Structures are given as structure tokens and as C-alpha cells.
């Protein structure tokens, strides 16, 4: 039985102009947050509206008082935290949040290649992105993002942290398809999102209750693309300003 090589064909396509943050994908958000108090790595335990302001209790029992509250979290988490204060039209939405598993790797001594991303027709590997193509930095190290298919992620999302086979299989698929040598990989890290995105969208772009001043914006309102999050946030901002 002879060996049958795998082939894939590259095709360059012209597309609309794209914009990305120079330092990172969240560079624009960080710019607009300058001068505003921020708190990170703080999990919200519960929220309460006392008819005057919001009381936001963190898991360390710290209470933050705020005139308004805006959620950007996945739909299942939103319902747990804010069910008491949301309109039924939001609570009754049929939102199917889908998972993904992503592995980041660094490849030493890699020459620059004219590729930004590759999509695969595979049951496990959905696509890979060549991060160096964004021209944010100069490096002899090739940085790649490897993302699984939704179907496979649904099977593995609850075990990827404790089972190294999940990460190893994603990397193995990447190596087989690209020809990059395993011994060239000097860094690898895998992360999963159980509620990554909603590919079907919803009838709404955002939600704002001007009486209680609770708002919701998220990509799952609109679709699975990165810009869906911005479009939802922009729509919420317009609603807040309209009813200010």
C-alpha cells in the first residue's frame, strides 16, 4: 500500500480593508478606557438593585456600587446573574452558544511566509492563523493560532484541561497539514471557551432598560464574527445616549 500525500491549494483573494489593534486585539478598548477606574480578575457573585443604584458583590465579598450595569458575558451566564432584572424578550431568546478549543504555538527559526490563515476541511481542525502576518512585531519565531471545529470541541471542552491528548491531537493535525517539524515547536498553550459564540444571532443587537439602567451587549446578539461584539456595543451606546 503506497503513501498518499496530502495536498492543499493556496488562493490569494482580495478583500475589504481590515483594521486591527497595533499592539493587540483589545488596543482600541484600552484606549477608550484611559482615565476610567478598572478592576480585572474579579468574579461577580451576584447583583442587586436597591432602586437607587446597583450593588455588585464579588466572590471576595467586596461590594461595588454603580449607577448603571452593563453585561458582556455569554448568554447562559447572563441568565444566572441577571435573570431577576431582564425583560422576558431577552430571557426567552433561543441562543445556542457553541464551544471552541484553541492552541497557541511558537515555532523557532521560521521564515516569514505569505499566509494569514488557512481553513481546513477536517473533522478536528477548523483553521489556523499565522499571527506574524499582522505585522505587529518582528521575530524569527513563528506564532500560530490553531482552532478546533465546533463539533469536536463539544466532545472535548470539559476534558481538555486534564487530558493532554486534546492539545497533542490539535498540534499533530497542524503538523500533518503544514509540514512544520514537531521539534521546532518551542511553546504551546491551549485554552477553551465553553460559550464561545452564537452563529445564528438573534432579533436584537443589544438591550437597554433605561429605568433600572441595566444593559447587555455581546457578539451573540448578532453573530459569530469579531465585529459582532463591536456592532452590539455601538448599538447599546446609541440607546443609552438616546434615552439619556
How should these model regions be labeled?
Residues 134-140, 187-216, 220-222:
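FAD-binding beta-loop-beta segment adjacent to the flavin cofactor pocket
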Residues 9-31, 159-169:
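Short beta-strand to alpha-helix junction loop
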Residues 208, 213, 218-242:
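A conserved FAD-binding loop/helix module that cradles the flavin
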Residues 138-143, 148-194:
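Flavin-binding catalytic cores
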Residues 40-55:
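A conserved short coil-to-beta-strand element within the FAD-binding core of flavoproteins
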Residues 63-116, 180:
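Central helical "cap/lid" subdomain
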Residues 59-61:
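Glycine-centered tight beta-turn/hairpin loop motif at sheet-sheet or coil-to-beta transitions
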Residues 1-6:
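N-terminal FAD cofactor-binding segment of flavoenzymes
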